[in-house]
From Swiss-Prot:
Keyword terms: Endoplasmic reticulum, Glycoprotein, Hydrolase, Membrane, Protein transport, Transmembrane, Transmembrane helix, Transport
Region spans: Disordered: 37-203
Compartment(s) where it occurs, according to its Swiss-Prot or TrEMBL record: Endoplasmic reticulum membrane
Membrane-spanning parts: 214-234, 882-902, 929-949, 980-1000, 1005-1025, 1053-1073, 1103-1123, 1130-1150, 1172-1192
EC number(s) recorded for this UniProt protein: 3.1.-.-
Species the sequence originates in: Neurospora crassa (strain ATCC 24698 / 74-OR23-1A / CBS 708.71 / DSM 1257 / FGSC 987)
Gene expressing this chain: bst-1
GO molecular function, one term: phosphatidylinositol deacylase activity
Pfam family, one: PGAP1_2nd
Membrane topology annotation: Multi-pass membrane protein
Described function: Involved in inositol deacylation of GPI-anchored proteins which plays important roles in the quality control and ER-associated degradation of GPI-anchored proteins.
UniProt-annotated glycosylation sites, renumbered to this chain: 41, 45, 155, 235, 582, 960, 1212, 1239, 1242
Ranges of compositional bias, category Polar residues: 37-48, 69-83, 143-156
Name of this protein: GPI inositol-deacylase
Length: 1256
C-alpha cells in the first residue's frame, strides 16, 4: 500500500499533505525527484499512456492572484502556488521549474519496464482518487435546502493512518475519509459554471490569511487602553479610600457537644449535616440546656466553629455581669444556649438547591432544639418558666439568607423564629447569578417577604412578629459588596433595618467578611443587644416586636437619627433639685455655657439654661458636648445633666416619689424646687477628637480611649420642661470641658443643591463663620451614589490665645441604610458611601429628593475664626468603587465582544471562504460593529433611565409587571443604575472588555502553542524510525476517521451520565478540554502543513474554544458544589442540573470538530440566522448578562446546536443523510413501479446521487 503525500483536487486546488514529522521538506524533495524520474521514463516510451500531473505538492497560503498562469516552484521549494481563478479539471503534464530533460539512454530494458509498471500503478491510483472525489462531490453538493458550500476538510490522506497517542477519545470521523474540496466534480456542467461565476465574483475580495498572532495598531492601542484602565481600577481599589482596620482580637475556650440522636429519623440530611451545642469551658461544663436558645448559621463554605467568639462573649458577659445583677435577672435575662450547625462547609452562594436543603434541615433542627427544653433529663431550666417556643437566629454571610429562607419552607413551624440578626449577608440580590436555581430562590424569598409586609392587617402577615437586623461590614468587606446587605427593599423600618459597623457606638470601624465574627468591639455590642431583647418570662423568649426594635436601634444606631427615640419626654421625674432663689446660676437666654474645667468652685454647682418656648418662629435645637461621662440618677460621678420643671410642692407634701434628691440651697428658706429627668439614657457616645487622635477606635495593644458624651434635642422634645440643669458634682478641680447651647436650626443646617457635573468640574466650597454654633450640618442631596468617592478638606481653626477645647470632628452619614463614619482630628477626609448602588432594588419607601449624603461638623465655638471647607470628587478614588460593584460584569460583558467577533468571522467566511483569525476579526469589529453596538447600548441606557412611562419600563422588565407597585427589578439592566451621570460606564466597560478579550485570546494562543510544542517533543521519532523508509511514509497524527457507531455510543454514554449521575456542567468541562485538544492538534497541522484549509480550520476551532471558555466560569461553581458533595459522600443528584438538552449540542459539536471537519459555508438565507443569533446573544449579554448570567450558557448552547446542524449537512451519518436515504428508496421504488419519478435535471442528479451512495 502506498501513501499519497499530496495531490490536487479536480478544480486545481491543493489538498492537505501528510508526511512524517519533522523532515517534511526532505521527504517532499525526495518524492518530487521520484516523480520527475517517472515522467522522464514515460516520455521515452511511445506506447506509454499520457503523462499525469505530479501527486506530491505542499501548498502554502498566498495572496490570491489575478493572473491565469499558475506559478510553479522548483524541486528545492516545498510549495506550489496556483491561481484561484485557474480551474483545470484534467490537468496535463506539470513541468517542474529548473528541472532539465533527463537522460534515459543508459537504462536497461528491465528498468524501463519497471518504470512503466510504476507509472501504470500511479495512473490507476489517480483514477481511483478522482472517482472517490466525484462520489464525494455528488453526495455533498445537494444537502437539503440549506445551499451550503462545502469547505476544505482537514486531512488529505485517503489511507487510514495508525492511531496516535494524541488522538482524543472523542476523535471520530465518518467512514468516508475527508477530502480537500473545491468545486463540484464532473457530475453536472452547470454546477461547475455556477461555481466559476461565484469564484470570479469574490476573487480579489478574499482577505489575506494572516497569522493568528498578528495584531494591528488599532487593536493594540485599544487593548492597551482597556488593560490600562483596568489596572487603574484595581490599583485604586487596593490603594485608595481604604478604611482603616481597627478590630481587636477576641479569645475563647471553646467546647462542642454533638447531638448524635438528631439522625435520619428527624431529617433526611442527618448523614450530611450535624448539630452542635457550644460550651465555654470553665463556665459551662455540661451539655444541658438552661437558657435561651440561639441558633448560629454559618455562611458560604463556613464552619460551625465560627460561632465561638460570639458565644464565648455571651457566656462570659452573663457570668461576670448579668448574673450578679438582680434587676437584670428579674427582667428576664438568662444565659444563651448557642447551637451551631456543621454544613461540611457547603457552598451556598452558587447553588440554590443547597440553600434550600440547608433551610429544610434547620427547620427540623429548631424543632429538635425546642424539644430539648421539654426533656427534663437534658434540660436544667427553671420549671417555673414557660417552655421556649422560638429561637433567636444569627446568620453570617449566606447563612443570613438561609435564615430568611427557613420561613418560606413547607416544614417551617409557625412562630418558631421571631428575631433574625445577620452579618454581611447579601439580602438584596444573589452574589452571582450563575445558577438559575439560586436566582429563582432569591426571587421567591424576597417576593414572599415583600408580599407579607404589604398586607394591611397584622392577621394576614405571617411575619408580623419577625424582626430583621442586617449588619454590614463596610468597605473592608471585599467578598460580598456591603450594598447587597440592604434590607430596605424587603422590610419596613418598623420590622428591620440595615446598619454598618462604622455606625455602632464604641465600634466605629469597618470589618472584612470574616472579621465581623471575631471583632472584639463588635461582638461585645452584639451580645449586649441580644441580652437586652431576651425575656425568659415569655414563651417567645424575647420582648415584643416594638421593644426589640427599640433596643436594636439603641445599641446599633448612633442615636442622632430621626428614628432614634428620646426617653426624656416619656419618663416621669426621678430627681428633685433644690436651688437657692438667686439668679447667679441661670444663664441668660441665647447665651452659651462653656466650662473649661470641672470642680473649680470646690463644691457642687448647678448651671441652668432656660429652654426657649416651642412656639418661637425660629426652630431651636439644644446641643451639649463634654469629654466626661454623664451620670445617671443617684450615681456619684462628676457631671450630671437634668431637664427640669418647677415643682410647686405644698408644705408637708411627700418627696419620697423621687429616686434622687440634690439640695443646693442648704438651710435657706428661700429656695426653688425643680422636678427633673436625668438625660443620661439619651446620651450619644462620640469618639474623642483631640490633637493626638488618629482613629476613632483603639487599635490592638492600645489603651482604651476616652469618649465624648453628646446630647441633642429639638425644642419640641423638651418643651414640657423649663430648664436644662448642668450639675458639676466634683469637689476637686478636674480637667475637662462642657459646651451647651441653644442654636437656630436655620444657622446650623445647610442644604447645597449642586449637580454632580458641576461638582466634578469645580468642586464645592463653603465657610463656617466665626459666630457659628458648635454643631453645623451640611446636606448634599445629589451625593447618593456608591460609585463616587470624595475628598473633603477643612482648614485649621484659629483659637488665638485661648486653648482649643477639642479638634474638629466630622461625621458623614446616610439615613437609608444607616451608615455613619467619624473622622477625628479632621483636616481632610476620604469620603465614600454605600448609598444608591448598581443592581440593588429600590427601597420600599421611596427616597425623598432631599435625601443624600450629610455631614456634621463639631468645631470649637470659642475659636473666633472662620473655617473653610472644600469638597471635590476624587476621580482616581472613584475608579476603585467600580471593582466591587462591577466584578460580575466581566463574566458577561466580554461575551458581547466574543460573539461580535465570531459573527464577523462567519460573515466573511460565508462570503469568501476564508475563516479569518480572532485577532483579525476583532480588528474589523473595532472599526465598525463594536463602537456601533456600544453607542446603541449607551443611548438605550439613557432612554431607559429617562423614561417616565411605566409601560416603557415594563418592556424591559417583563417578568415583574405589577400595576401601581414598585418595580424592584428596575436596576437589573445594563450597568444597574438609573443615574444618567454614569452613561460613560457602558463604553468604559466595553473598552476594558476589549482589552480583556485580547489578552485572553493571546493567553489561549500561548497555551495552545505550548501544548502543541510539548506534544511535538513527546512524539519525536527516534533515529531507527527516521531511517526506516517504510515508516517515513506514515502520516502526521491529525484527524483520523472512526466509525459513526463509536461516536454515537460515546455521545450516548455522556448523555446518560448527565441525565442520571453527573451535572451537565461536568460534561461541559470535558467538552472544553476536548475542544482544547482539538485546537492543539489543528495548530500542529496548520503549522506543519501550511494551507488555507488548515488555517481556516484552526481559526475556526480556536474561536469556538474562546467562546466556550468564556462560558466556563458560569458552569464551574456548580461543578465545585458537585465535587464538594462527592467529597462528603453525599451522592444525591442535583435535580436542576441534569437536563441533557443543556449539553447535547456542545457534545455533538465538539465530537464533530474532533474529526477535522470544517463547517460548511452557507450561501442561502440561513446565513443571516447565524449573524442574527450571535448578535442577539451579544445584546443579551450586555443588557441582562449580569442579572441573569446563567442564561448565557443556554444561549451559547443554541449557537452550538446551530453549528452542529450546519455540520450535519455534510456528514454522512447525519439526520439529513437519513432523509437522503429515504429519498433514494422512494426514487428506486418509483422507477420500479414506473410511477412517482422526477424528470429533467433533478432526475439525473438524484439518480447519480443514489447510485454513488450505493457504491462501496
Amino acid at each position: 500500500m502506498r501513501t499519497r503525500l499530496a495531490g490536487t483536487s479536480e478544480d486545481g486546488h491543493l489538498c492537505p499533505v501528510e508526511a512524517p514529522f519533522p523532515n517534511v521538506d526532505f521527504l517532499l524533495h525526495q518524492q518530487l525527484q521520484q516523480e520527475q524520474d517517472v515522467y522522464a521514463n514515460s516520455t521515452t516510451n511511445a506506447t506509454a499512456s499520457p503523462p499525469i500531473a505530479p501527486t506530491s505538492v505542499l501548498p502554502r497560503p498566498s495572496r490570491p492572484s489575478q493572473s491565469s498562469a499558475a506559478e510553479r516552484t522548483s524541486p528545492e521549494s516545498p510549495s506550489v502556488r496556483q491561481s484561484p481563478t485557474k480551474r483545470d479539471r484534467n490537468p496535463g503534464p506539470s513541468s517542474i521549474s529548473g528541472a532539465g530533460p533527463l537522460n534515459l539512454e543508459h537504462q536497461s530494458p528491465s528498468q524501463q519496464s519497471q518504470n512503466q509498471q510504476q507509472q501504470q500503478q500511479q495512473q490507476q491510483q489517480q483514477q481511483q482518487q478522482q472517482q472517490q472525489q466525484q462520489s464525494f462531490y455528488a453526495r455533498s453538493r445537494r444537502s437539503g435546502n440549506f445551499n451550503w458550500k462545502l469547505s476544505h476538510s482537514r486531512n488529505g490522506s485517503i489511507e487510514k493512518p495508525p492511531p496516535s497517542f494524541f488522538s482524543s477519545s472523542f476523535s471520530h470521523s465518518p467512514s468516508t475519509p475527508p477530502l480537500s474540496l473545491g468545486a463540484p466534480a464532473n457530475g453536472a456542467a452547470h454546477s461547475k459554471e455556477m461555481e466559476k461565476e461565484e469564484e470570479q465574483k469574490f476573487v480579489g475580495k478574499r482577505p489575506r490569511i494572516r497569522s493568528p498572532w498578528a495584531i494591528t495598531f488599532v487593536t493594540l492601542l485599544i487593548s492597551i487602553l482597556g488593560i490600562g484602565f483596568l489596572a487603574l481600577v484595581l490599583n485604586s481599589s487596593f490603594t485608595r479610600h481604604i478604611d482603616p482596620k481597627g478590630c481587636r482580637m477576641s479569645y475563647m475556650r471553646p467546647g462542642y457537644a454533638k447531638f448524635d440522636d438528631f439522625d435520619t429519623e428527624h431529617t433526611r440530611f442527618a448523614s450530611k449535616y450535624s448539630l452542635y451545642l457550644y460550651r465555654e469551658l470553665g463556665i459551662e461544663n455540661d451539655a444541658k440546656v438552661r437558657g435561651v436558645p440561639v441558633l448560629f448559621i454559618p455562611g458560604n463554605a463556613g464552619s460551625y466553629k465560627q460561632v465561638r467568639p460570639i458565644a464565648a462573649e455571651a457566656a462570659n458577659y452573663f457570668h461576670d455581669v448579668l448574673q450578679q445583677d438582680e434587676s437584670a435577672v428579674k427582667a428576664g435575662a438568662r444565659s444563651l444556649d448557642f447551637f451551631t450547625v456543621d454544613f461540611n462547609e457547603d457552598i451556598t452562594a452558587f447553588h440554590g438547591q443547597t440553600l434550600l436543603d440547608q433551610a429544610e434541615y434547620l427547620n427540623e433542627a429548631i424543632r429538635y432544639i425546642l424539644s430539648l427544653y421539654l426533656d427534663r433529663t437534658r434540660s436544667d431550666r427553671d420549671p417555673n418558666l414557660p417552655d421556649p417556643t422560638s429561637v433567636i437566629v444569627l446568620g453570617h454571610s449566606m447563612g443570613g439568607v438561609v435564615a430568611r429562607t427557613m420561613l418560606i419552607m413547607p416544614n417551617y413551624q409557625a412562630n418558631s423564629i421571631n428575631t433574625i440578626i445577620t452579618m454581611s449577608a447579601p439580602h438584596a440580590r444573589p452574589p452571582v447569578s450563575f445558577d438559575s436555581e439560586i436566582v429563582k430562590t432569591y426571587k421567591d424569598i424576597n417576593d414572599y417577604w415583600r408580599r407579607a409586609y404589604s398586607q394591611q392587617w397584622a392577621n394576614n402577615n405571617p411575619l408580623w412578629h419577625v424582626t430583621l437586623v442586617s449588619i454590614a461590614g463596610g468597605g473592608l468587606d471585599t467578598v460580598v459588596p456591603s450594598d447587597y446587605a440592604s434590607v430596605e427593599s424587603l422590610v419596613p423600618d418598623t420590622h428591620g433595618f440595615t446598619v454598618f459597623t462604622t455606625s455602632i457606638p464604641n465600634v466605629w470601624t469597618s470589618m472584612d467578611h470574616a472579621a465581623i465574627l471575631w471583632c472584639d468591639q463588635f461582638r461585645k455590642a452584639l451580645v449586649k443587644a441580644i441580652f437586652d431583647v431576651v425575656d425568659v418570662n415569655r414563651a417567645a423568649q424575647t420582648k415584643p416586636r416594638a421593644d426589640r426594635m427599640r433596643v436594636f436601634k439603641r445599641w446599633f444606631l448612633t442615636g442622632m437619627e430621626e428614628v432614634a427615640e428620646k426617653t426624656v419626654p416619656s419618663k416621669d421625674p426621678s430627681t428633685l433639685l433644690t436651688l437657692e432663689d438667686n439668679l447667679s446660676s441661670v444663664i441668660a437666654q441665647g447665651e452659651r455655657l462653656v466650662l473649661r474645667s470641672l470642680g473649680a468652685s470646690g463644691a457642687v454647682r448647678a448651671h441652668l439654661l432656660p429652654i426657649p418656648p416651642s412656639g418661637s418662629p425660629e426652630a431651636k435645637r439644644f446641643t451639649l458636648l463634654t469629654d466626661h461621662k454623664l451620670d445617671v440618677s443617684s450615681e456619684s460621678g462628676r457631671l450630671e445633666v437634668l431637664f427640669c420643671s418647677v415643682f410647686p410642692m405644698q408644705p408637708g407634701q411627700a418627696v419620697a416619689g423621687f429616686a434622687a434628691q440634690i439640695n443646693l440651697a442648704g438651710d435657706s428658706s428661700a429656695s426653688t424646687r425643680l422636678a427633673c429627668n436625668n438625660a443620661a439614657s439619651d446620651v450619644v457616645t462620640l469618639p474623642a477628637s483631640l490633637r493626638s487622635s488618629q482613629y476613632p477606635f483603639s487599635k490592638e495593644g492600645e489603651p482604651p480611649k476616652t469618649h465624648f458624651s453628646y446630647l441633642q434635642y429639638d425644642v419640641e422634645d423638651i418643651a414640657e420642661h423649663q430648664y436644662v440643669a448642668v450639675i458639676e458634682k466634683t469637689h476637686t478641680p478636674t480637667p475637662g470641658f462642657v459646651i451647651a447651647e441653644f442654636s437656630d436650626v436655620s444657622q446650623s443646617h445647610r442644604t447645597r443643591h449642586i449637580s454632580l457635573r458641576r461638582l466634578l468640574a469645580f468642586g464645592m466650597k463653603f465657610r463656617l463663620p466665626s459666630s457659628r454654633p458648635m454643631v453645623s450640618e451640611l446636606k448634599v442631596p445629589t451625593m447618593q451614589s456608591s460609585l463616587l468617592a470624595y475628598n473633603l478638606e477643612i482648614s485649621e481653626q484659629n483659637c488665638g490665645k485661648q486653648q482649643e477645647l477639642f479638634a474638629p470632628l466630622i461625621r458623614q452619614y446616610l439615613t437609608e441604610p444607616y451608615e455613619s463614619k467619624f473622622f477625628v482630628n479632621a483636616r481632610e477626609a476620604a469620603v465614600s458611601i454605600h448609598g444608591v448602588a448598581p443592581y440593588v432594588p429600590p427601597p420600599l419607601k421611596s427616597r425623598s429628593t432631599e435625601d443624600g449624603l450629610s455631614f456634621q461638623f463639631w468645631t470649637d465655638p470659642t475659636c473666633a475664626s472662620n473655617i473653610n471647607i472644600k469638597m471635590s470628587i476624587d476621580v482616581m478614588g472613584s475608579l476603585g468603587k467600580l471593582y466591587m460593584r462591577y466584578r460580575t460584569v466581566f463574566a458577561a460583558f466580554p461575551l458581547l465582544v466574543v460573539t461580535l467577533v465570531l459573527r464577523k468571522q462567519f460573515r466573511i467566511y460565508d462570503t469568501t471562504g476564508v475563516f479569518i483569525s480572532f485577532s483579525e476579526s476583532l480588528d474589523l469589529c473595532l472599526r465598525q460593529s463594536i463602537p456601533l453596538v456600544l453607542a446603541f447600548l449607551t443611548f438605550l441606557s439613557l432612554f431607559i433611565w429617562n423614561s417616565s412611562s411605566s409601560a416603557t419600563a415594563n418592556i424591559w422588565n417583563w417578568a415583574n409587571v405589577t400595576s401601581g407597585a414598585i418595580d424592584f427589578h428596575q436596576n437589573d439592566l445594563l450597568i444597574g443604575t438609573q443615574d444618567p451621570f454614569f452613561w460613560f460606564l457602558v463604553p468604559v466597560i466595553g473598552l476594558i472588555c476589549v482589552g480583556i478579550c485580547t489578552v485572553f485570546n493571546y493567553m489561549t494562543l500561548t497555551l495552545v502553542h505550548i501544548l502543541s510544542t510539548a506534544v511535538s517533543l513527546l512524539s519525536f521519532r527516534p533515529g531507527w524510525i527516521r531511517n526506516d523508509e517504510r515508516r517515513k511514509a506514515l502520516p502526521l497524527p491529525a484527524f483520523y476517521p472512526t466509525s459513526p457507531r463509536r461516536r454515537m455510543v460515546t455521545t450516548a454514554i455522556l448523555l446518560v451520565l448527565v441525565s442520571t449521575l453527573i451535572p451537565y456542567q461536568f460534561a461541559y468541562l470535558v467538552c472544553c478540554l476536548v475542544q482544547l485538544t482539538t485546537t492543539v492538534r489543528a495548530q500542529r497541522l496548520a503549522s506543519d502543513l501550511r494551507s488555507a484549509a488548515n488555517s481556516n480550520f484552526y481559526n475556526y476551532v480556536h474561536s469556538i474554544l474562546l467562546l466556550m471558555l468564556w462560558i466556563l466560569p458560569i458552569n464551574l461553581p456548580i461543578l465545585v458544589v458537585w465535587i464538594h458533595n462527592l467529597a462528603v459522600h453525599w451522592l444525591t443528584p442535583f435535580s436542576s442540573h441534569h437536563n441533557v438538552l443543556s449539553i447535547m449540542p456542545f457534545i455533538i459539536l465538539v465530537e464533530t470538530l474532533t474529526t477535522g471537519k470544517m463547517v460548511p459555508r452557507v450561501n442561502s438565507r440561513f446565513k443571516h440566522f447565524t449573524s442574527v443569533l450571535l448578535f442577539g446573544i451579544a445584546l443579551y449579554a450586555a443588557i441582562y448578562g449580569v442579572s441573569y448570567a446563567y442564561m448565557l450558557h443556554y444561549l451559547v448552547n443554541l449557537v452550538a446546536a446551530w453549528l452542529a446542524i450546519v455540520h450535519s449537512t455534510s456528514d454522512n451519518w447525519s439526520v439529513l443523510s437519513g432523509i437522503k436515504h429515504i429519498s433514494c428508496t422512494l426514487f428506486d421504488a418509483g422507477n420500479t413501479n414506473n410511477v412517482g419519478g422526477v424528470n429533467g435535471t433533478n432526475n439525473t442528479m438524484l439518480a447519480e446521487d443514489c447510485k454513488m451512495r450505493k457504491e462501496p
